[in-house]
Amino acid sequence: MLKTVTLKTALLTTALGLALAAPAAAMEKSEFRVAWSIYVGWMPWGYLEDSGIMDKWAEKYGIDVEIVQINDYVESINQYTAGAFDGVSATNMDTLSIPSGGGVDTTALIVGDYSNGNDAVILKGEGGLADLAGKPVNLVELSVSHYLLARGLDSVGLSEADLDGVINTSDADMIAAFATDDVEAVVTWNPLVSTILEEPGATKLFDSSDIPGEIIDLMVVNTDTLEANPDFGKALVGAWYEVMGLMASGDEAALTAMAEASGTDLAGYKAQLASTEMFYTPAEAVTFTSSAELPTTMVNVAEFLFDKGILGEGAPSADFVGVAYPDGSTTGDAGNVQFRFDTTYMQMAADGAL
């Protein structure tokens, strides 16, 4: 999945879209649209649409929910931010920078998983993270790969300034780039990581399992829309955890359908799931979302985004956007809360109250 903010283009495009398309206020309604893009942890969205599970839960609450696959990840978030969708699959980092940073109050309705090895820093030859000093590193700039690199460098007392530059490289070109003599190190995500590590001399220096719980994959929804239409949240969460139950039980038909939709086979999809910490039960998701570690993670993410100039247009500090947590606490500006981690609906699922 292209988990990235393409420089400041996404933010500028979003600002224009908001000015033209954002609704004045959320209203009670019966038809909803949700966008998603291909990634191991989000394949259930395609399955619950194709299988009729989403329709079943929507009908239970007397509403209609359309689940739409968007091939461009950043574009899906931009369209959500501009009001074309009521919800979208996104990482915590990209939610903070694009919709929340752009002034669209957004709620993490479902905390689905975190990357636990899917993203990695890879060196050509032997060595450790400290050996990146003085070397160029190829990655998708301003993406979770960039964030992973920053966290890795920090762990050994280095920063990006100690490198011989970061070279913005498309994920589509990453495998070919690693094979060239000029490229010494890359940061990318699966399935590219698995392919590159098959190359002779490729050494994994650091991966997302070294920062567990920091690259989080979510289903986020417009806060005002959710507040005006709680049945929308109930239907989405109910459908999601029905599919989680199928996955947890090893339902091969469901898993094979997800694998094929993501362009791999069952074995390949299971390999990707192995480096993804899926929260198959709502209770697990609630526990993670209520943890003391989440606010610290979001502060780290906000500082990274501010340092790169993408925490909202004209953000004066890393505290520009407020983030609220289930216990009522906040990080960032408590007077500008635009991102909310809310366990209400996941707790309903855990309690069997949907």
Which functions belong to the PLM regions below?
Residues 1-12:
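Bacterial N-terminal signal peptides that target proteins for export
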Residues 13-14, 24:
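Cleavable N-terminal signal peptides
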Residues 20-26:
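Sec/Tat signal peptide C-region and signal peptidase I cleavage site
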Residues 27-169, 184-190, 213, 353-354:
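Short, glycine-/small- and polar/acidic-enriched structural segments
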Residues 55, 78, 82, 96, ...:
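Solvent-exposed, polar/charged alpha-helical surfaces in well-ordered, non-transmembrane soluble domains
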Residues 94, 166, 172-267:
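Pocket-lining segment of extracytoplasmic ligand-binding domains
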Residues 228-314:
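Secondary-structure end/capping motifs
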Residues 302-354:
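Conserved C-terminal helix/tail region of periplasmic/extracytoplasmic solute-binding proteins
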